[in-house]
Amino acid sequence: MLSWVLLAWAVACSALAGASRLTPSVLPLVVRNPYLSTWLADARHEPWSSWPIFWTGQHMGMSIMAHVPSTGNTYPLLGRPHDSLGPNNPNNGCFLGSKYDASTTNMTYLIQPEGKHLAGESVKITITFLSPITPTSTLRQSIPAGYVTIRVEGNMNVNIYMDMNGEWVTGDRGSSLIWKMDNIVDTGKGESLYQWQVSRKTEQLFTEFQDRAEWGMLHFLAPQGVRYESGTSMLLRTRFARTGVLQNRNDERFRTVMDEEPVFAYSKAFNLNGTDDEPNIEAIHDEVTFTIAHTQDPVVQFASARGLTLMKPLWESYFPDVKSLLNFHYFDLDKARILAHRYSNQLARDAQLSAAEDYVDVVALTARQVLGATSFSGTSDNPLLFLKEISSNGNCQTVDVIFPSFPFFLYTNPRWLAYLLEPLIEHMLSGQYPNNYSMHDLGAHFPNMTGHPDGKDEYMPVEECGNMLIMGLSIVNSLRFPPEANTTAPWYPGTLEARDAEPDVVGLFPLRDLQTVGGIDRLDSVWGVGPDATNLARKWVEKSYRLWRQWTGYLVEFSLEPHNQLSTDDFAGWLALQTNLALKGIVGINAMSEMSRFVGKTDDYKYFKNISDTYITKWEGFGFSRDGTHAKLSYDWYGSWTTLYNMFADALLCFHLDGTEYDTHPRTLDDQEPIAPPPGKTGFIPRRVYEKQSKWYANVRQKYGLPLDSRHLYTKSDWEFFSMAVSSPSVRSEILQSYAKWVNETSTDHPLTDLYKTEEDGGYPGPNFFARPVVGGHFAFLALEKACNGKATDGLKFLDDKDNNSPEDIPEDNVHDGDADNEDSQSPIQDSDGSEVKAGDQAQFPIQDMDDSQMTIVNEND
């Protein structure tokens, strides 16, 4: 039976516990790029229950402990350093919970030792991991470093210890390391910093081992006033547990990662108790900040227009050397906090208005994961952003990975989306890719962006052409917003002053002329202001118009009836006549018609517009079930159904506003009047398609969300949010609740997966995806709220107005004459293991088309 003291202690822990609403299994700690990516494993348990992990799930050596001098007790806070202390150190504090926003993860603890002589003494410790997302400062976003701040509050003295090991610079535990302690002196401030520098003895450029970089250097910084030491992990931790201090010395016996595991440590003493003569009764607070950086030069190799190029990090355009960078970063903490908090706060406000409280946590969890797949490079004249296809195969700059992530970039900073597309456009304009459709990726494995001169990249021609055209027009539209629309955008720096590129600048979107606003320096100039921005958008389209037109020509020939090929959901296999894929291609053609009109190519505009209008009518007849209730997976697969997540692009690009009262889309050339829409035509994709799909999603929703299609019970979370964004508010709310339930209950044990089971334990269906940037699709609601001068969601209000249960007829001459034209030849619905889902199973799907039977959906988990 618990003593009253222990019972009170347990109640105190419970009463003080505070956490974010959603409880994922893993939380971000230091996440900046594909190689600086450390996460809290088992995040539903105490942070000392396991080691932090790399995004692959492998352990990362980082630990934090607290030592209380008055009792001699040592408490693990993060990682498992107590494994080094033996069984005689069972002390655990009270973990009060984790909280997170877009840039920050906080973990809070309470230490309150037992004993009458310690009555009333306690200390609260908060560890804050800050990987600041700064949409108004691309320079800061490009810095490969994060902050760790440990704040103590109370009236009891406490010593804090933190260490790291060589797993931060190699994935091979047999690698030989070198390290040193160094000082960085800030002559302006008169302050200096300690710096542990750790690297492989022999670096291997552009090489990975288990997805970790085998080149680059770890920098672990601390302020003056701390103590430091390197040496064998067990010895350092044991000595700290006994004495509470480190020895200010360096173990110079270089060795491999796990040969008497060398660690690099700091300790800090906090005197919160005062003195014996004047003890502190009231709680006081203090803190210490460490920074963790991983620098590489070069960062990738890229087959640019001038040939294979070793690409430097973007930060080198602003700092003469690494020490200058690290010094700036450390002392920039206050400004970085302000900018990161501005973004997090606005994101929370916008998410709350767009959906619900759960959505606030969803996008907060997503943000660092998206940017954790990217690496800023290029120069201030021509910045570039490179992306790794995390976990699925490691491809570079994969177009159909950028596409699902692009709502995040449109909402957060469209400039970064332009930087993502630029390497692809430059490479293909240079003639290094032989096919007449868009390439799938820039290289088989990051960081080697060597292209595919043989044209044998993964075959997704309709997919990638449609993706590039849709994203291209979205960038153009972001530049055509009026100034008042941009003042509410996350990338708005606080002034509408626009700064033009100088004539000798290579790129159209440089970062050469940074500005100071409100006492914060090194901010970007505003994106998308007035006629200058419109002219910039026009130049951007014209520069690569040949490619846009070439890709559209391919879609004209092949998108209406796509032959057997892959879509972005390549794990589902090859399939001909995919309804959703065809829709992407047709929307892409319509996007090209708009870009042609924008740059004054009248003949191209008329041609592509006529084609897209003709195709969309035929597509509806081909792609919908004969009773007109839902889209089929493919034109000739009767009894099937699919999510139409590519319909999101129709709304995002404002095509759904055509002919409506909300049609504020810039639609005229300088020298001609707009072409009137056909009588009675509202929108590009008919409204009835939106309405039917929204109703269908409500019918087929499962315990953990909306399945991708009728083949399996798995889903893709990015496409769920694309689909939700263009559904009725009630359907959106229901699916969002299912997704939030999944976040809280899933058995997955890595950073957020985008591919999961909607039933059972919500686990991986195989393949196992995790930490991928495609979760940027979770920002679909927010990107849509900002689109079309803020009118995009107004144009979807028709989804609220009625509940039309009578499907409109589809002209018979538009029904596709496929191979499987017998309505009775239906394919069974399959679970993720390939087995048929039968009547009476926990989650039933319709196994017949609605023409033949009345469908009943049973979901026992609702």
From Swiss-Prot:
Ranges for region Disordered: 798-862
E.C. number(s) listed in UniProt: 3.5.1.2
Any GO MF annotation of the entry: glutaminase activity
Listed transmembrane segments: none
Signal peptide, first to last residue: 1-19
Localization terms from the record: Secreted
Keywords from the named record: Glycoprotein, Hydrolase, Secreted, Signal
Coiled coil: none
Pfam families: DUF5127, GtaA_6_Hairpin
Cellular component terms per the entry's GO annotation: extracellular region
Domain of life: Eukaryota
Catalytic activity: L-glutamine + H2O = L-glutamate + NH4(+)
Glycosylation sites: N106, N273, N436, N448, N486, N610, N744
Biased composition, class Polar residues, residue ranges: 853-862
Record InterPro entries: Glutaminase_GtaA, GtaA_central, GtaA_N
Function per UniProt: Glutaminase catalyzes the hydrolysis of glutamine to glutamic acid and plays a key role in nitrogen metabolism.
UniProt similarity note: Belongs to the fungal glutaminase gtaA family.
Name recorded for this polypeptide: Probable glutaminase ARB_05535/05536
Originating organism: Arthroderma benhamiae (strain ATCC MYA-4681 / CBS 112371)
